[in-house]
Curated annotation (Swiss-Prot):
Belongs to the elongation factor P family. Pathway: Protein biosynthesis; polypeptide chain elongation. The gene is efp. It comes from the Bacteria. Its main location: cytoplasm. Transmembrane segments: none annotated. GO terms for biological process: peptide biosynthetic process. This is Elongation factor P.
């Protein structure tokens, strides 16, 4: 289905140069004496490469309709990640290449949405926040209060985030999946 570039929104899947791309950000720009254009940040769903592309406002964009299926993460075996459809209990496995940075947030029983196009998984949508356990960090200070001072903490999935000094090993914290940043204690 073709739409004008001005109707492109983050989260859409589009076909660009014959390949599927996820739209990450869209900015409408109108420089002084030039025609308006759309600056979009895209991720190639096959290769995972991120790039920016400039579309003219009237350019037709081919929007791809994908099937979004709620699934639950079960486990991983090397580079294979296994998910279960929560409606019919069928299992699907995806390669690490397809998941990209999302693997740093996957824990057992995490509810996610998997996008399928022509029966092939093309990506996943994580929840806004996830709860992860701190496995390694410097000891906390008893008198530490919320301030701009932070320290690195390694989480159960291997993700490293900056946390306040009062966070200790073994604590569960809430992490923003879009920014990869500490939000609060769980």
């Amino acid at each position: 289905m073709a739409i004008p570039a001005t109707q492109m929104r983050p989260g859409m899947i589009i076909k660009h140069n014959g390949e599927l791309h996820a739209v990450f950000s869209v900015e409408h720009r109108t420089p002084g004496n030039l025609r308006a254009f759309i600056q979009a940040k895209l991720r190639n769903l096959r290769s995972g490469a991120m790039f920016e592309h400039r579309f003219r406002s009237p350019d037709p964009i081919e929007r791809v309709i994908v099937d979004e299926i709620p699934m639950e993460f079960l486990y991983n075996d090397g580079d294979d990640y296994y998910f279960m459809n929560t409606e019919n209990f069928e299992q699907t496995h995806l390669k690490r290449d397809t998941l990209g940075d999302a693997v740093e947030y996957l824990t057992a029983n995490l509810q996610i949405t998997v996008s399928f196009f022509d029966g092939v998984a093309v990506g996943i949508e994580l929840p806004q926040t996830v709860e992860l356990t701190v496995v390694e960090t410097e000891p906390g200070l008893k008198s530490a209060t919320a301030s701009s001072v932070t320290k690195p903490a390694t989480l159960e999935t291997g993700l490293v985030v900056q946390v306040p000094p009062f966070i200790n090993e073994g604590e569960k914290i809430r992490v923003d999946t879009a920014e990869g940043a500490y939000l609060s204690r769980a």
